[in-house]
């Protein structure tokens, strides 16, 4: 196994949260498909499940946005000359994930998987600031999600655009 996940639960309500094994499976698939090999380098990711207050504070501090958000990605910046397998940290807000799943009429597990994958791709350097970047990232997210047996996470948006 090339992946170690440090799962931190900082949410008061833990009912219905994905297990460490589920996060491991989703992130492992994202890393393998992005690298196009199951033999990607050894990697460590911290996933912290938080409530709205912590998400709000972090989103305001690091992105200047005065509200909680679904997922924040903090890539690890390795100091020069040091070899560490740390990819970075994902902060996922339980309440936002649950609200979005209901609003978007998605199965909760699928939305958790999607945000873990989305955040992992951000840690790998993907972004969606331009249409071209968004198309590349969303295409890879969809491919990964479908390989895991989930629907295209952007199907509702694509249907609206058509």
UniProtKB/Swiss-Prot annotation:
Keyword Ion transport included in the entry's annotation: no
Locations listed in the record: Cytoplasm
Gene Ontology molecular function: metalloendopeptidase activity; RNA endonuclease activity; zinc ion binding
InterPro entries in the record: MetalPrtase_cat_dom_sf_prd (IPR023091), YbeY (IPR002036), YbeY_CS (IPR020549)
Enzyme Commission number(s) from the entry: 3.1.-.-
GO cellular component: cytoplasm
Keyword Cytoplasm: yes
A Pfam cross-reference name: YbeY
Gene3D superfamilies: Metalloproteases ('zincins'), catalytic domain
GO biological-process terms attached to the record: rRNA processing
Cofactor(s) the protein requires to work: Zn(2+)
Binding site for Zn(2+): 118, 122, 128
Keywords of this entry: Cytoplasm, Endonuclease, Hydrolase, Metal-binding, Nuclease, Ribosome biogenesis, rRNA processing, Zinc
Cofactor binding summary note: Binds 1 zinc ion.
UniProt xrefs under PANTHER family: ENDORIBONUCLEASE YBEY, CHLOROPLASTIC (PTHR46986:SF1)
HAMAP family found in the cross-reference section: Endoribonucl_YbeY
Similarity comment: Belongs to the endoribonuclease YbeY family.
Function field: Single strand-specific metallo-endoribonuclease involved in late-stage 70S ribosome quality control and in maturation of the 3' terminus of the 16S rRNA.
UniProt protein name: Endoribonuclease YbeY
Organism encoding this protein: Glaesserella parasuis serovar 5 (strain SH0165) (Haemophilus parasuis)
């Amino acid at each position: 196994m090339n992946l170690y996940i440090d799962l931190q639960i900082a949410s008061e309500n833990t009912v219905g949260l994905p297990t460490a094994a589920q996060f491991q499976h989703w992130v492992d698939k994202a890393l393998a498909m992005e690298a196009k090999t199951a033999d990607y380098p050894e990697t460590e990711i911290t996933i912290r499940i938080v409530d709205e207050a912590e998400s709000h504070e972090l989103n305001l501090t690091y992105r200047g946005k005065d509200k909680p958000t679904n997922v924040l990605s903090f890539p690890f910046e390795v100091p020069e000359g040091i070899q560490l397998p740390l990819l970075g940290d994902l902060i996922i807000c339980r309440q936002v994930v649950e609200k979005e799943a209901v609003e978007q009429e998605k199965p909760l597990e699928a939305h958790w998987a999607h945000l873990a994958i989305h955040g992992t791709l951000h840690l790998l350097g993907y972004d969606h600031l331009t249409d071209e970047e968004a198309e590349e990232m969303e295409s890879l997210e969809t491919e990964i999600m479908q390989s895991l047996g989930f629907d295209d996470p952007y199907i509702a948006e694509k249907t609206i655009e058509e």
